[in-house]
Structure formats: structure tokens, C-alpha cells
Amino acid sequence: MRFSKLYAPTLKETPSDSDIKSYELLIRGGFIRKISSGVYSYLPLGWKVIRKIEQIVREEMEKIGSQEIMLPIIHPAELWKMTGRWEDYGPELMKLKDRHDREFTLGPTHEEIVTFLMKNELRSYKQFPVNLFQIATKFRDEIRPRFGVLRAREFIMKDAYTFHTDYNSLHESYQHFYNAYENIIKRIGLKYVVVEADTGAIGGSFSHEFHVLAQNGEGEIFYCEKCGYAASDEKARSGEDFSVDENEAFKEMEKVDTQHAKTIEEVAKFLNVSEKKLIKSILLRSSKGWVMALIRGDYEINLAKVRSVLQDQSLELADPQDVLKEFGVNVGFIGPINIPENVKIIADLSVKSIKNGVIGAMEEKAHYINANAERDFRINLFADIRYVKEGEKCPTQGCNSTLKRTRGIEVGQIFELGDKYSSKMNAVFTDENGEQKPYIMGCYGWGVSRTLGAIVEQLNDENGIIWPKSVAPFEVAIIPVAMNDEAIVSTSQEIYDYFLKEGIDVIIDDREVSAGFKFKDIDLIGVPIKIIIGKRLKEGKIELKQRDKEEGTLIEFKNVKELYDKVKEKLENYDPTQNLTI
């Protein structure tokens, strides 16, 4: 490719709406353009990188026997209603109606569609297992799209689905996808971590996420260096001991005036007690009714864990105005005493350790002190429903180490669905004994457009993007520093022609602009290797420079073949993550 023919509208200025480095550099580098909030066009450079990512994904899918299909974007509402996800998925489901007033959604994921498709195809145990995938555009009505292509309304995703007659077969496929996903990240050339994950709105019994490590990653990851335990913040457990202090005597519960103190900090300060003595009461609401979650005052509730424990993905934090209307009290004074019986109370394990605690009194300006769980108020269920903290004990039995925290960007997630969808949609097969049984399923998602943003987020510097060679828009850039010098131009052309013939993805910057301008653009778009042909050509020397290194190397230029061999060797050893610290 000649830069003079390339449509790559690079920008010097940072976009005014930039909220993350990857968005800034993809815009400035001419890879993408914003159409509206969360909706982007991919320009030639951006689409070229996307296609290279897709190719790696396709090859790894084919290695494990997954066959490519294409499913519809528009999904009939009745299929989502069959599984209950029409309501449970929440407002992120982008719904629409046709001219006949029939309801549809733009697919964020395809479990219902693929299950409906296969229920009419797979009838006998002899037809299993089946492994299918697609790469397609998906839609999610994000409440606040942000971080560029990392959290968009419209995005490109690879989703795969496997169908089995038993769980042993499912486990085998799950491991195949686990290995394939690791291969994808390794082939792209990124630092990553695999973590235990919450199944969320997809559902199922078991899941792992694949995170690209990045300082500005949107996801928190907790891990143990000693035993290798790792989990997303939504799933992470700890080995903290929440035993009761047996030396402290139980006291009589008493209502006290706490005036205008509402928050945990205000109440603790007013009563001159530790936040660990307070029991935070949080009201949640779903289509199934009200839930009160209790947690120790110094911890934060983990909504994903509550949803998982109660098997209710529609649970959300209740609106304070709805709480006031329903219970006649502001959220700062709610508590489990005198709460109606139809409100389910779930308590974090940390509440077990609180003796003579402080809770809201369900009336304005009042709290109870010396309150004790199960003696003074009911609890329907104890469970782990909090976010862990860095420095807590590792949950692995016998490890005795502590958890550390880092940040990452989720690019892939795999799920063991079991019969979650097949049982609800009556997708059954006849087994060897003539009995009908529901399909056992797995699903496996990979965010193609998210990977684009994640790469840039991990690999960049003050000059621009540092693409790994596997997905770089070009592997090599040839830069003739003076287009009016015949020797420089002819040598550059000779090198360009040879590299093209040898199959190198190469660009020559043949624009009539200054050398400095060329260097800035080539660095901005992140080409791994630069071949700089300048005035030293008269001495038989040219410069090679790697994108991830500050200094270049002057080499003797004898012939194009020898230069090609040197560049090829540099490309083979090129690893911009080598000195990366995250």
C-alpha cells in the first residue's frame, strides 16, 4: 500500500469527548469514526485490523471443529419470552415493532435463536455433539455508552454454541474452547489472565472470563500469586473468617435518635462506633418483588452475587422515591425490623460476625443499637453477597496467602449452560433408550471489536498505538525521507517491491511531506518495523527501528534480500509486551 493512496485521516488533536486512551488513539489514527453515542464506523485501517482479529478467531474455531454459520440479527419476541429473558434481560435489550405491531429485538446474543434453530434439526442422540459459531454484529442498548468500542451499542462478536447429550461431552467442549481462547490471545500477542466469572444474564452453572490486562481496564480482577486463584470482582471470594467474638456479651436492643445521620459514615461517627458494627440495609426490586440485602457497614454489596444466589437477573437497586412510597421511610433509615413479611431478607456472611450491631429502625431519624441477627430480626438466607477487598485471605484451602487486585478488559467468556434454554424451549432429543431428554448446551463469546480496543489500551505510548505484528494494519513501513532524492526514492521502491513479492504486509510513505510528519503518522498508526532511507544511504546505510523501542539501528545496506532477512528476523522476535508492567 502507498500512503498517498491510503484513506487514513490522522488527527493531531485529542477528541474532546475522549474518555479513554484507546478511543483517543483509534480516532486520531484514522481507524474509526463516531456516528452517534456508542455507534462507530470502521475506516480502512480499523477494518483491516478487525479482519485480522477475525481471521485468528476463525482459525482457532476451525481447529476445534467449530463450523461457521450466520444467524439473523432480528429476533422474534416470542422466543425470548419462552426463556423469560424478554423481561429478565432488562432495558439493555433493544426492542422494536414492525408495521404489523409484532415485537422483535436486535440480538445482543443468540441463545434463543440457535436453540430454536436446532430443536427442529437435532432429534436423535446419534446427531450429537454439534459445534457452531458465527461472527456478527450485536446490539445492546447501553444506558451510557463509553470507552469507545469497549462499551458500544453496536459491536462485533464471535458467538459459538455446542449441543450435547450429556455433561461429560459438554465439559470436553468447554475445555476445548478454553484452550482455543488462550491460543487466540497468545497469537494476538497480549498479556492476559483467565478468571472465574459470574454467568449473568446468559445463565448456566459455570463460566470463565478472559481478560486483557490494562491499567485503565474497566474490570477488576482479584488473584493469588501463590496458588493461581483468579476471579472477576463479581465472582471473587475470600477466605476471611467471620466468626463471632465469644467474649462480647449480648446486650438489650435499644432504639436511639440519630437525628439527620443517614450514611454509614455519618451514623458511625454520630454513635462513636466502628463501621464494622453497622449493618447496611439495601432494598432491591425485581419483577418478583422486594428483597432486602444486609451487609457489614465497611463492605459493598455485589449485585451480581445477589442475582446469582436468588436466581433473579432482573434485581436492581430500588429507587429511593419508590422506597419512600412503599415503606414510608427514607433509605438512610431502613432496616430489617418491622419490614413486611413479603420482603425476602438475604444477609452477607459478614453479618454473622456482628454482635450488638446498629441497624435502621424503619422510621425517620432513628436506628437500633445492640441488634443481633436472628434474635431481633429474621434472615431468610445467608450467602456471600459482597465485593472482596485487596489483601483479604485467598479462598483456596491451605493456601494462606492474600488476594491482589489488578485491572483488565474482558474480551471473551465461556459458559456451561446445561439445559437452561433447551428445557424452556422444548429442544429435546431421543436417547439410546428411546427417552426424550433436553439438549445439554454450552455457549462461548468473543468480543472482536472489544479486542481492537483492548489491544490499544494495553499497547500504546505517548506517540500512538503499538500494534502486535499479528494484527497490525501493516507489518513494515518504508519511509523515504526525501522524495526529491532519486537514489532514496528508487531504493525505497526496490525494497517495497521485494517485500510485497515476499508477502510482507508493507506500506511505503510516498507522500510529499516532511520526514517528521511521516514519522509521527507511522508511529501513531503503530506499524511494528520502520525502514528509514535517508541521507546515510550515500554511505550504504539505512535505519531499522522497532515501534516499541526508542532507538533505531543503522545497518549496512548491501542488497534487498539481506535486508529482508534482517527485517523478517526482527518481525519474528517482535514482542511489545516483553517489558510491559501492568
Curated annotation (Swiss-Prot):
It is an enzyme of class 6 (ligase). GO terms for cellular component: cytosol. Keywords: Aminoacyl-tRNA synthetase, ATP-binding, Cytoplasm, Ligase, Nucleotide-binding, Protein biosynthesis. The keyword Cytoplasm applies. InterPro entries: aa-tRNA-synt_IIb, aa-tRNA-synth_II, aa-tRNA-synth_II/BPL/LPL, Anticodon-bd, Anticodon-bd_dom_sf, Pro-tRNA-ligase_IIa, Pro-tRNA-synth_IIa_bac-type, Pro-tRNA-Synthase_IIa_type1. It catalyses: tRNA(Pro) + L-proline + ATP = L-prolyl-tRNA(Pro) + AMP + diphosphate. It is found in: Cytoplasm. It comes from the Bacteria. Its main location: cytoplasm. Homodimer. Belongs to the class-II aminoacyl-tRNA synthetase family. ProS type 1 subfamily. Consists of three domains: the N-terminal catalytic domain, the editing domain and the C-terminal anticodon-binding domain. This is Proline--tRNA ligase.
